[in-house]
From Swiss-Prot:
Protein name per the record: Phosphate acyltransferase
Subunit structure: Homodimer. Probably interacts with PlsY.
Gene name as annotated: plsX
SUPFAM superfamilies given in the database record: Isocitrate/Isopropylmalate dehydrogenase-like
GO CC annotations on file: cytoplasm
Length: 342
């Protein structure tokens, strides 16, 4: 396999190089064929590199800049004025062919605006979609999109999201003919607004997609489908609510295991199994939201991601670049549109 290079916005997120650089080093250890461009303030990045092994350090290139997009910057402002920011320069590395993908924990709106302008959209895609992986009861991953990039979506946009989500599931998890569903207020054919209804009709008449109909919120984690499509308003609320509930359950489980002598003894005996369950429930385990529909790979990490979570985002970008996800989406869309228009 040929080597891959990712550009990292090392200054992005709540913690900057304190998290991004140690995570980058660990990602390089996990992926021997990976090289990284660390974009940011060299004086802040370099101290974290001093103890790295020679093999790891040799696969890092620094791209120096002191400018940073703030988390409260408006997308239009960042696009116009942050010309030398670590976020923009990281994306430009991809645009200029120096990197195969980009990872940032910075301002989501600014990242989307810059990526859309600098990398452009794939033919047949009107808007980029944010998509992330969720856990399911049966252990399979479930992809939910859109997560907030597009508050309102017409039926054609929802259809495009379904295609892109299906290809993502195939590429990353190697699932043959992933089941795709539309998130709705009921499973009956008559339920939902006009755009959801029209998107359903398009999907029903697209044999290249394995459309499974409507799905309700209480079935998101059932594992019955592989891809769930909705507009960004619904998707963002769903994701944030899920993360909050997961943290609540982890907190309550830890509290419950700390009460009572017998319970504490059992907790120690079952510690490895309990920790595995806690890890599976932890939202950081699924960190990394992909911006689908662009001509190159861009992954958005949580702004407050810790080192482990940021490694997940880097690994996701690595997998998507290795599988050539944008090219797969482009080819699938072209094939489907050809069938529709024939």
């Amino acid at each position: 396999m040929t080597n891959l290079t990712l550009a990292l916005d090392a200054m992005g997120g709540d913690h900057g190089p304190q998290v991004t650089v140690p995570a980058a080093l660990q990602a390089l250890r996990l992926h021997p064929k990976l090289s990284l461009l660390l974009v940011g303030d060299e004086t802040q990045i370099s101290p974290y590199l001093s103890s790295a092994e020679i093999d790891v350090r040799s696969r890092i290139t620094l791209v120096h800049t002191t400018e940073v997009v703030r988390m409260d910057d408006k997308p239009a402002t960042a696009l116009r004025h942050a010309k030398n920011s670590s976020m923009r320069l990281a994306i430009e590395q991809v645009r200029d062919g120096m990197a195969d993908g980009c990872v940032s924990a910075g301002n989501t709106g600014a990242l989307m605006a810059m990526a859309k302008v600098l990398l452009k959209m794939l033919p047949g895609v009107d808007r980029p979609a944010l998509v992330s992986c969720l856990p399911a009861i049966n252990g399979k991953p479930v992809y939910l999109l859109d997560l907030g990039a597009n508050i309102q979506c017409d039926y054609d946009t929802l259809f495009q999201f379904a295609v892109m989500g299906s290809v993502l599931s195939e590429a990353v998890d190697k699932i043959a003919r992933p089941k795709v569903a539309l998130l709705n207020v009921g499973i009956e054919e008559c339920k939902g607004n006009g755009d959801v209804q029209q998107a359903a009709q398009l999907l029903l008449h697209t044999p290249q997609l394995n459309y499974a109909g409507f799905i309700e919120g209480d079935e998101i984690y059932s594992g019955k489908v592989d891809v769930i499509v909705c507009d960004g308003f619904v998707g963002n609320i769903t994701l944030k609510t899920s993360e909050g509930i997961a943290r609540l359950l982890v907190h309550q489980l830890k509290q419950g295991l700390a009460k009572g002598f017998v319970v504490r003894i059992l907790a120690r005996l079952l510690a490895p199994r309990i920790q595995k369950v806690l890890n599976q429930m932890n939202p950081d385990h699924y960190n990394g939201a992909s911006l689908l529909g662009l001509r190159a790979v861009v992954v958005k990490s949580h702004g407050n991601a810790d080192e482990h979570a940021y490694i997940q985002a880097i690994s996701l970008a690595y997998t998507e670049a290795k599988r050539r996800l944008p090219e797969m989406i482009k080819d699938r869309l072209e094939s489907i549109l050809l069938d529709i228009n024939s």
